[in-house]
Amino acid sequence: MDLFQFYKPYKKSLAFVIAGALLTAGMEVTFPMIVRHILGVVLPARDMQSLLYEGAGLLGLYLLCLGITYCVYCVGRTMGVRVERDLRNSLFRHLENLDFAFFDKEKTGHLVSRVTGDIGEVGNIIFEMPHLAVVCLITMGGSAFFLFYINPLLAVFVLMLVALKTGDTIFLNRKMKSAFAETRQHMGVVGSVATEILAAVRAVKAFNGENRAYQRFSDVTADLAKSQMRTFRYQAYMAGTVTFFSNAINLTIIVVGAVLMMNDLMTMSDLVAFLMYLMLFLRPIMQLTSLTEQYQRSMAGFHRYQELIRVEPKVRDGSVVADSRRIKGDVVFEHVDFAYPDGTHVLKDFNLTIKAGEQVALVGPTGAGKSSVASLLLRFYDVTGGKITLDGRDIREYTLESLHECIGIVQQDIYLFSDSVSENIRLGRTDSSQADIEAAAKDARAHEFISRLPRGYDSYIGERGVMLSGGQKQRLSLARVFLKNPPVLILDEATAAMDNETEKQVLQSLAELSRKRTTLTIAHRLATVRHADRIIVLSDGCICESGSHEELMKARGEYYDLYMSQFNKT
């Protein structure tokens, strides 16, 4: 993938920019010859009429060039903004499609830096690249031709110095490329650390961790500063050499030009035109020199964009569309093995059949693999062995979107967006009406507290629902599932953040909702799963016991020990 493919949707804009650049550069190349004619022919003849005509014509060309340049910049900058938008959207969509294994090893702040800062740098050169390429080609080529046309000897002296400067710039560009890439890397680390610390600001303050957090942030900014200083040294060297070569060229023109004029090999009008063409010739070089920093920074950002866009999701989309209205909810785990990308084995030859409408609970100690079962059913990860079927079909055959339409989940770790209550509930079904949202909230026992909010369902709840209590956030999460109304439910510690009275109310609602739906409940508090049709006890990724609450208590096995330990604590 290269940057040029993003120009394709904007071919007309690109063509306009190139055509405008051709016109303006072409006109600029003719200006010095008109001045040469005025100074060398019109002025000595004292022809006032010709002077006025040619002066007016030159002014008209200047104004025309101004108008075209304005239009080119407007169209070109608009194109640049749109390409930047396309790049950012394509990267964000790609990130959305990546699986959890990718996000387990990547820092959120680092990814945010790539979506925002890196793409922003790329957008800066979208217009400059094609525009300057055309302008420089025409201006430098035309100027070089006329320099030799006016005086070949002086042109050779001057262009030798220009060639030396160009070689020096090429050498320096190679050095700056690696320096800018390193700087972008450090900027990503700074963004990642800042995001992580600010997201956990309550924990930082609660444990008096401000100094430690500051030291951590200070360390990464120090690394960034070192990288930036290396870049600045290259920039300083480039600025110094530009000044030196400019002065050397001016000195050459003065000395050699004076000698030529003394020997009647050059006129004053020739020297003035030569200087004007030299300025035209050097201006693109100066522009390219100043653009070098921006280009290297932009390319460093684009390469980081490419690194992400080339990451292939390990969880591949299927082709079969599951109709949530027709799915019964028969779920089968057949000889399932699962290990996380770091090699940690969680499930080993795991077999479980859940009939449509059955309520099954998964219990066991921390790390037994309970939540991993839910993640596999949702295809947050794919099994490393065996298969999982929904209504007899391997879930890997379903499209991810349709599979997720069939499964509703309420997790212990709730995420609410910085939006209104209604929009947070509507995540369960985006096409739902306000009446549907309120009905779902009532089912989740959330309507009462929502009605007491300043603006009711239109109330803003802050980032991650910071303005709500833990129980209120959990009830909004439940309301999403009530609104979605899927054939399969996953309740992962769904009532963990609720007080006893609220938990009792919600459990009644869940019992009603689960009556005709396949329900997989993951619980640490065993009192919440006593009425499940079947309780599965996990230990080290394997099923060690299975049965109803009464059967397992009579067996006096691991479930009995877990239950009694919790009962004795209470």
Identify the residue ranges that each predicted region occupies.
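A short amphipathic helical element positioned immediately N-terminal to and/or at the very start
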Residues: 1-11, 111
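Transmembrane helices of ABC transporter permease
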Residues: 9, 13-24, 58-61, 128-182, ...
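An intracellular "coupling" helix at the cytosolic face of ABC transporter transmembrane type-1 domains
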Residues: 11-12, 100-101, 117-126, 130, ...
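Transmembrane helix-loop-helix hairpins at lipid-water interfaces of multipass membrane proteins
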Residues: 14-71, 75, 148-153, 264-268
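Hydrophobic alpha-helical transmembrane bundles that constitute the permease/transmembrane domains
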Residues: 22-33, 59-70, 122-125, 129-141, ...
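Helix-loop-helix
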Residues: 44-49, 53, 146-160, 230, ...
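Helix-loop junctions and hydrophobic alpha-helical segments within the transmembrane domains
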Residues: 91, 95, 204, 305, ...
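ABC-type nucleotide-binding domain
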Residues: 318, 324-570
